[in-house]
A protein has these predicted regions:
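RNA-binding accessory domains that recognize and position tRNA/RNA substrates
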Residues: 1-182, 192-238, 307, 355-360, ...
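A short alpha-helix-loop-beta-strand transition element characteristic
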Residues: 333-341
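Structural beta-sheet core signal
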Residues: 183, 207-209, 242, 287, ...
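The feature marks non-catalytic terminal segments
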Residues: 340-390
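Conserved G/P- and acidic residue-centered "switch" motifs that form tight phosphate/ATP-binding loops
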Residues: 188
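Active-site adenylate/phosphate-handling loop in enzymes that bind or generate adenylated species
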Residues: 131-133, 166, 172-178, 245, ...
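A conserved beta-strand->alpha-helix junction
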Residues: 228-255, 344
Length: 390
């Protein structure tokens, strides 16, 4: 009996002539994710991914947990393979699913026969194996409408496979197939979720954090490093760009009207993000903005913020309720880190009465006393780059 992981891709099915590009990217991402775990054979055939241990040291359970988080995979299941013979398939089903069959009060058999040369139809094989299983496990009965257990058989060109229920995986599209984007990673609940959601659409991420030491502590920096590390379970390796932001914020406080502090700060963030994007082949900027959540996230405020960049600004959380964002944060494992009580740069010099309905002209006038280019260049020159691996 050969134990393996059987994975089915998601939206790759919808692709046309460039389908192979997405498949190759998915296989490469899976191999990269498995490399720290052990040696595995990864094969893509007939729109399915097969993962087998290449030696005794390879941990298939650890591989299951890792691959389930790879974007581009819709479902994953443990399976076993055998020759394409009805009796071999029956024998495998009896042994491989013995515990599940013993525990179940009812079951049914479903067959997918992609190899049409197999001499039995899908229904015939299901009936044959189902009859044999019912005889071997008298504790259970056949129930084709609402069974406790579904025994799944797949007859493919290279072998036959037996498994039970497939589990939902990460879904989405393979990271890297839709280009790259700079993503703002603050340390709160929202930005890790927005980063996750854009990566799920196949985008390679370059995370950027604006650090305002000593107004924010080294613990705040460590918090963001932890969030980036947690995200790599889905995104793969990334290089975190830590931007020194203290001088910019001090200059804003010194020279600009208080009600515009946050808006001017965010305009600087956009300028710096655009510069980072240009040096990392990124075609967009990702933010965790949520319409109306805070004063800087009104339509007028966001228009002022985005006015300084030529890149598209992607806002995956823009219409979501906070509770839905929190739900995703819990699911992907970033919530507990996000709520650690370490402030980020967005809480430094917060205006008492922020402008909520600004115009671009007003904000441009408010920041006109600053040497914008010099401040941006200084910040970019001081960037600390930290590679984040799995």
């Amino acid at each position: 009996m050969k134990d393996l992981l059987l994975c089915k891709p998601g939206e790759i099915f919808l692709k046309g002539l460039n389908k192979h590009y997405f498949e190759e990217r998915l296989v490469a991402n899976v191999k990269r994710r498995l490399k720290p775990i052990g040696h595995f054979r990864v094969t893509y055939l007939q729109s399915a991914l097969y993962i087998e241990a290449a030696d005794d040291a390879a941990d298939l359970d650890a591989a299951y947990d890792a691959v389930r988080k790879v974007f581009g995979i819709a479902t994953i299941t443990r399976a076993a393979a055998c020759e394409k013979d009805k009796d071999a398939i029956t024998a495998l089903a009896k042994t491989y699913l013995h515990d599940a069959m013993t525990a179940a009060r009812s079951f049914k058999v479903e067959t997918k026969r992609s190899d049409k040369r197999f001499p039995m139809t899908s229904i015939e094989l299901s009936q044959y194996v189902g009859g044999e299983l019912a005889e071997a496990f008298p504790n259970t009965v056949v129930d084709v409408h609402d069974p406790e257990l579904t025994v799944r058989l797949e007859v493919r060109e290279q072998a036959a496979y037996v498994h039970a229920q497939a589990v939902e995986a990460a879904g989405g599209m393979p990271v890297g197939c839709n280009g790259a984007a700079v993503t703002m990673l603050s340390g709160g609940i929202d930005s890790p979720v927005s980063s996750y959601m854009i990566a799920k659409r196949g985008v390679r991420l370059v995370p950027v954090h604006f650090f305002s030491f000593p107004y924010t502590s080294e613990l705040a920096k460590e918090k963001v490093l932890s969030l980036a590390k947690e995200l790599t379970a889905y995104t793969g390796r990334m290089t975190l760009q830590i931007v020194p932001f203290t001088h910019i914020q001090e200059e804003i406080r010194r020279a600009c009207p208080e009600e515009y502090f946050t808006l001017i700060m965010r305009r600087f963030m956009m300028r710096i993000a655009e510069d980072i994007a240009a040096h990392n082949e990124c075609k967009a900027i990702v933010t965790g903005e949520n319409l109306g959540q805070v004063a800087s996230q009104t339509m007028e405020a966001m228009a002022c913020t985005q006015d300084v960049t030529h890149l598209p600004v992607l806002q995956p959380l823009i219409g979501m309720d906070k509770r839905d964002i929190v739900k995703i944060a819990r699911e992907i494992g970033t919530f507990d880190t996000s709520i650690l009580p370490y402030e980020d740069c967005c809480t430094v010099f917060t205006p008492r009465h922020p402008k909520t309905r600004p115009t671009v002209a007003e904000v441009a006038e408010a920041e006109s006393a600053l040497d914008i280019d010099a401040l941006v260049h200084e910040a970019v020159d001081g960037i600390e780059r930290i590679r984040i691996d799995l």
